[in-house]
């Protein structure tokens, strides 16, 4: 394979999902595989970091082999290797970083540390219909809730963020209160479909304050108190919680668009798969003339495809790690990233 074809391998191991993606400079995404260790963690009611790390060790090499074989490429065809360096669980990040650095060193190709949330932010660029820069991005996941003004790849300004629980974390904790198990977000969404919108009305924290920051911990507390009083109204509580969170996110997105003057909104991260949220945002977009872009459902949650894409942009721009030492950044501000030339 001619080296004019730039091929990037992406490795995602920031939490409980092991993902591998392969991105080609001419063909785009040519392969990806994902393994989730949700079943391992479900009996504990949440992610156990040590178990997640051990599972990454078992899964990542077979996934790489499968992706390369299915795409009819070999390790020797790779031009660079990108890996999630943060934010995330330290042990889990170390697995991906160590493997990526070792492979890159042995193959004589560059490696690149990728910011997990930049991967999510750029995931809609894997679709046929792609957003154009500049835009506002709403990143909603189990660990983060952020509004970002995106002028170009690597040129990011945080407009607002959660001051306590991320919205995905609030979904999971509320689901646990309702006895729905882990992961709770999808289960709560399913239960909410059976709920009555008019039974309960949850508060909308911080929507009447200036600024674009979020707070979701109060909703979780409100859900617990409501459930204590009305234990037979699980579906109605789930519905009220979902309505409140989608309203908060919609209101803040609209304010961010008005503040920046942007006409494009990108919504990504695990919670972006929520259909009620998409419906609410799409309705807002039609009303104010804003174009909204999402990743396909399989790329809303953590995956290797988005890491391969984000890594490809930077590696093909000449950016790479300066050495093969294993470095991770469990806490990493997205504003620290450099702009692509």
Curated annotation (Swiss-Prot):
Binding locations of Fe cation: 116, 120, 302
Record keywords: Acyltransferase, Cytoplasm, Iron, Metal-binding, Transferase, tRNA processing
Gene Ontology MF terms: iron ion binding; N(6)-L-threonylcarbamoyladenine synthase activity
Gene3D superfamilies named among the record's database cross-references: 3.30.420.40
SUPFAM superfamilies, per database record: Actin-like ATPase domain
InterPro entries per record: ATPase_NBD, Gcp-like_dom, KAE1/TsaD, Peptidase_M22_CS, TsaD
Binding, substrate: 139-143, 172, 185, 274
One family name in Pfam for this protein: TsaD
Superkingdom of the organism of origin: Bacteria
Cofactor note: Binds 1 Fe(2+) ion per subunit.
Catalytic reaction(s) noted: L-threonylcarbamoyladenylate + adenosine(37) in tRNA = N(6)-L-threonylcarbamoyladenosine(37) in tRNA + AMP + H(+)
Keyword Transferase: yes
EC number: 2.3.1.234
Cofactors: Fe(2+)
GO biological process, one term: tRNA threonylcarbamoyladenosine modification
Subcellular location: Cytoplasm
GO cellular component annotations of the record: cytoplasm
Enzyme class, UniProt record, top EC level: transferase
Family in the record: Belongs to the KAE1 / TsaD family.
Functional summary from the UniProt entry: Required for the formation of a threonylcarbamoyl group on adenosine at position 37 (t(6)A37) in tRNAs that read codons beginning with adenine. Is involved in the transfer of the threonylcarbamoyl moiety of threonylcarbamoyl-AMP (TC-AMP) to the N6 group of A37, together with TsaE and TsaB. TsaD likely plays a direct catalytic role in this reaction.
Protein name, UniProt field: tRNA N6-adenosine threonylcarbamoyltransferase
Gene: tsaD
């Amino acid at each position: 394979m001619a080296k004019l074809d730039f091929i990037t391998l992406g490795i995602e191991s920031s939490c409980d999902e092991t993902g591998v993606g392969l991105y080609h400079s001419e063909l785009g995404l040519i392969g990806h595989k994902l393994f989730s260790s949700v079943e391992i963690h479900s009996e504990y009611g949440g992610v156990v970091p040590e178990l997640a790390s051990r599972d990454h060790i078992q899964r990542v090499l077979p996934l790489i082999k499968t992706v390369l074989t299915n795409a009819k490429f070999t390790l020797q065809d790779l031009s660079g290797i990108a890996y999630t360096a943060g934010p995330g669980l330290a042990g889990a990040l170390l697995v991906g970083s160590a493997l990526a650095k070792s492979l890159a060193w042995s193959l004589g190709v560059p490696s690149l540390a990728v910011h997990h949330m930049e991967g999510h932010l750029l995931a809609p660029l894997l679709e046929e219909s792609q957003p154009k820069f500049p835009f506002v991005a709403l990143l909603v996941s189990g660990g983060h809730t952020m509004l970002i003004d995106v002028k170009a790849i690597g040129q990011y300004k945080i407009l607002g963020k959660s001051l306590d629980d991320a919205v995905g974390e609030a979904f999971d904790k509320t689901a646990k209160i309702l006895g729905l198990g882990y992961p709770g977000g999808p289960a709560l969404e399913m239960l909410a479909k059976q709920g009555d919108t008019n039974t309960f009305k949850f508060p909308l924290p911080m929507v009447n304050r200036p600024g674009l920051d979020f707070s979701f911990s109060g909703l979780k507390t409100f859900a617990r108190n409501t459930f204590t009083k009305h234990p037979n109204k699980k579906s109605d509580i789930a519905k009220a919680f979902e309505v409140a969170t989608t309203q908060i996110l919609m209101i803040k997105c609209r304010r961010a668009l008005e503040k920046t003057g942007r006409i494009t909104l990108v919504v990504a991260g695990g919670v972006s798969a929520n259909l009620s949220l998409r419906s609410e945002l799409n309705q807002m977009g039609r009303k104010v003339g804003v174009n909204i872009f999402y990743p396909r459902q399989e790329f809303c949650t953590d995956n290797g495809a988005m890491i391969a894409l984000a890594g490809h942009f930077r590696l093909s721009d000449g950016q790479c790690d300066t050495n093969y030492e294993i470095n991770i950044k469990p806490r990493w501000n997205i504003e620290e990233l450099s702009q692509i030339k």
